[in-house]
Structures are given as C-alpha cells and as structure tokens.
Amino acid sequence: MISISDTAQAHFCKLLEKQEPDTNIRVFVVNPGTPSAECGVSYCPPDAVESTDTTLEFNGFDAVVDAESAPFLSEAEIDFVTDQMGSQLTLKAPNAKARKVDDDAPLEERINYMIEAEINPQLASHGGKVMLMEITEKGEAILQFGGGCNGCSMVDVTLKDGIEKQMLAQFSGELTAVKDATEHEAGEHSYY
C-alpha cells in the first residue's frame, strides 16, 4: 500500500523517540477522491488507533491508515530527501485525487482517471484544468479546458505535444485523436 524509504523510516524513528512510548505515525488523505484531496502524516498515539484502521509495520514504528484513506494511498511513497536547500519529507500519492480504475474499466473511466491523476495536476500549476466532454464514434477524446488554460496562447502546444501524446500512448488502439472543444477567450484568467 505505502512504501517508505529507508531515509524516511530513519527520520520517523528519530521524531518518534521524542514522543510518548508506542506512538506511531498516521498517514491519511483529507477529501479523498476529489480534486482538493491532500495527504498528510501525523503522530498517532496508541489510544487513537481505531479497530477499522490498517497497521503497516516498518523498521522501528508502525504506519496507521484509516479505512477511508486506504484505497487512495495505494502506490503511495514517502521519502526523506536532502539537497542544497535542506531536508524535506515528500509524500507522493498518485491515487489520492481519484481511485485507480481497473485496466478493463470502460475507456471513459480510464481517461477520466488519467486526467485527474496525471494531467490536471500538471495544469494546476498554471491554474488550469481539462475535462473529458465525450468520446466520439471515431475514437476521438473531446476535451474542454478551463481556468488558466482557457484563452492561453500555449493551449495548442499543451494539447498536441503534451496531453494528446500522453493519451494516445496510454490508450493506443482505443483513441485516434484528442481534440479541444473549448471556445478560448483570452482574459486576465489566461496563463499566457
């Protein structure tokens, strides 16, 4: 479910030494399965463990996960990295915003998952997002851009060199093209 690097495990052990005995960590997702999902790590004293929690054993401590967060922490990775700027704990949870769908799920579900898990997080740095409007009989995914992407002069590059390439590679043989249905109006909301 969750992998924690050796450096992160050592970091947690050091932090937990200063806590009450038998305190562990809790890994959780606030608003799981939504675009506003956020992951976190906190201390988990023994009296805060619920019967429905999952307990994962690591070197020197346990990671406790609540039942609601568990499916959204599938494939999550926690690392502790040090660079010239200092040290930082990172938590990557690719399924926090959208529950991973099965490979045999309908094409529309798999495309929506890809949009929420991979594409929209990239566009969010510019205040943008994209939504799947329909899949045509010809296998074309029709998208609509919103936020900072609406009216952005780089939207064609984003679509052709980014999104379309990713989607056609991921859904080879199922999608033939990716098209934009947005009526772009440049304004203060536009990124470029």
From Swiss-Prot:
Cofactor-binding details, from the entry: Binds 1 [4Fe-4S] cluster per subunit. The cluster is presumably bound at the interface of two monomers.
Protein residues bound to [4Fe-4S] cluster: 149, 152
Entries under Pfam families matching the protein: Fe-S_biosyn, NifU
CC cofactor: [4Fe-4S] cluster
Keywords assigned: 4Fe-4S, Iron, Iron-sulfur, Metal-binding
NCBIfam families hit by this protein: PRK11190.1, YhgI_GntY
Subunit structure of this chain's protein: Homodimer.
Function: Involved in iron-sulfur cluster biogenesis. Binds a 4Fe-4S cluster, can transfer this cluster to apoproteins, and thereby intervenes in the maturation of Fe/S proteins. Could also act as a scaffold/chaperone for damaged Fe/S proteins.
Name used for this protein in its record: Fe/S biogenesis protein NfuA
